[in-house]
Amino acid sequence: MMKRFGKTLLALTLAGSVAGMAQAADNKVLHVYNWSDYIAPDTLEKFTKETGIKVVYDVYDSNEVLEAKLLAGKSGYDVVVPSNSFLAKQIKAGVYQKLDKSKLPNWKNLNKDLMHTLEVSDPGNEHAIPYMWGTIGIGYNPDKVKAAFGDNAPVDSWDLVFKPENIQKLKQCGVSFLDSPTEILPAALHYLGYKPDTDNPKELKAAEELFLKIRPYVTYFHSSKYISDLANGNICVAIGYSGDIYQAKSRAEEAKNKVTVKYNIPKEGAGSFFDMVAIPKDAENTEGALAFVNFLMKPEIMAEITDVVQFPNGNAAATPLVSEAIRNDPGIYPSEEVMKKLYTFPDLPAKTQRAMTRSWTKIKSGK
């Protein structure tokens, strides 16, 4: 979901490997495909040091890109990170291996309640483990929004971007949306009072029409560019992933560029997503992949990743190790009251997904 480490990162092989990893280390290269900027800077190096396995690490910024590679076959990857809303149909399509839990002793660290919830997409939790989760909400530059809007900008509401008279005021300072129809159109549906997983053509059309009304005031649709643009003050509002916006905030603070970034979960509610770790059916290094999955389930490793990417994780044993500032931030770890207003992204039927994609193409073109 971000771009800090570049398109491809080859983790250098370091000397040594631990006992019990000999079989995994027989195959010395592991190909991992993950969301951009979604791992700690030294995670891969630590894995290589422990196992002797090099990691070739590529990134993407949409589920659609990953799914196209998986369904085409021979993706070339050993580990991938699909969102839960795409997982069920990909499992049905037979693109993933079942996990050999006998080789995953760190499985015990996972959040049991979350694992139960995730069985809706993956019965028996046979194919994937939770990596990170988060929300899709409003990232904004309070100074630029105030300059454009005045003191009464509804920064805690979808009204900020879904009412034409509001978003029109923000055009001069820049507004971006995720380029993800299956995550953003449900936000419009929810705002209009419809179910986010509706397959009603009239309701889907209403969401499309809402976006066409605000389209002239949207600067761009992209699923990662907004991070640097928010951090640098190039845009003033981004509808994006919670952790990405917090990373933009951190980058601005590190740069000391006098840019302030904040994040709100809209009071009407918002979508929540779960990103999973899975092994493709055609993985060439299954043993190395299992070693990597087990490594990610180490509490100290997962806590370090959360501290960097600022998304909450699905590892119960890791939560106490996450920095207090992140654990106590309601934008990252929402309160129970806010959690009740969140919805999960549905596993949409192919017909509905195609309809959303057609609408999205129309919305982006503005026609």
Curated annotation (Swiss-Prot):
Effect of disrupting the coding gene: No change in type 3 secretion system (T3SS) induction.
Signal peptide interval: 1-24
One GO CC term on file: periplasmic space
SUPFAM superfamilies for this protein: Periplasmic binding protein-like II
Disulfide feature: 173-236
InterPro entries on file: SBP, Sperm_putr-bd
Claim: Glycoprotein is one of the keywords in the record: no
Binding site for putrescine: 36-37, 244, 275
MF (Gene Ontology): putrescine binding
GO process terms (BP): polyamine transport
Keywords: Disulfide bond, Periplasm, Signal, Transport
Localization: Periplasm
Similarity field: Belongs to the bacterial solute-binding protein PotD/PotF family.
Role noted for this protein: Putrescine-binding protein probably required for putrescine uptake into cells. Binds putrescine with high affinity (KD=3 nM), spermidine with relatively low affinity (KD=6.8 uM). Does not bind cadaverine or spermine. Putrescine binding induces large inter-domain conformational changes.
Record-given protein name: Putrescine-binding periplasmic protein SpuD
UniProt source species: Pseudomonas aeruginosa (strain ATCC 15692 / DSM 22644 / CIP 104116 / JCM 14847 / LMG 12228 / 1C / PRS 101 / PAO1)
Gene: spuD
